[in-house]
Amino acid sequence: GVDVLIGAHDHRPLVARKGETVYVNSGARASAVGHVEVSMERKSKSFIGMEFRPEVALLDKNRVDKDMRCRFASDIDAVSRYTARPVGSLKMPLLSRESFRGMCDYINFLHYVQIESSGADISFAAPLSFNGTIPEGTVRVRDLFSIYPYENQLYVMSMTGSEILSYLEYSYSQWIETESEHLLRIRPGRDERTGSDSWSFVGRTYNFDSAGGLNYTVDINAPEGQRIRIESLAFFSASATPEIYTVAMTSYRASGGG
């Protein structure tokens, strides 16, 4: 059987036991490590009295190993130089939080890049952070991670018109709250640090997909499955047919993520 099962990346830190198996998962974003202390007694050619003490140990970013920092100083410097490279400029800031109110410069920028770089008819994209910001002025490599923090690749898929419509209906159904005083699906909570009331979205921001390259409207008062009305392609496409369209999206979404 399996004595210890160690997981990673799954977003919820967890220490658990099931039968004789110990499970430890450190969570995401390298904020903790899974640690299991094992003690046993060797008897002849086998081990007896095995005990497992699992824990999730939080990492303190302020307690840096000096020897490790010295060992990797040249690598840290190389990354710093690379991320400081200018790649362009902006005449206005890009704010990901504006995506939740409708069309905005941030989400339009993602759609533009995906369509222009792939040649696709349509783009699916989502705000990958709630409050990512790039100020106006010079844009550097490190700024791009503020609005696009994940290492996805760009995929292009062929989809029918009905599939595109169903995709958008599903996306907006996860966000729109028709039978409520709120426009979007939010839930109340409590800030554990202050004890004050707080609010959060029911869904993850990176699942709030919209479409670029399409002229369409969303009726927030309509029932689920009847909210989207697609009017036309935003740009002429010689390759598109009434049945099949090319759609650019992240590899995460193309493989079924979200």
Language model features: what each stretch is:
Residues M40-V139, I147, W199, P223-G225, ...:
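A short C-terminal boundary segment appended to hydrolase-like catalytic domains
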Residues G1-R42, S96, F100-H111, I115, ...:
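N-terminal catalytic scaffold of extracellular/periplasmic and nuclease hydrolases
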Residues G1-R85, W175-E179, L183:
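Active-site-adjacent helix-turn-beta-strand microarchitecture at beta-sheet edges
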Residues P13, A32, M50, Y82-S89, ...:
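Basic, gly/Ser/Thr/Pro-rich low-complexity segments located predominantly at protein N termini
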Residues N108-G258:
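Feature captures C-terminal
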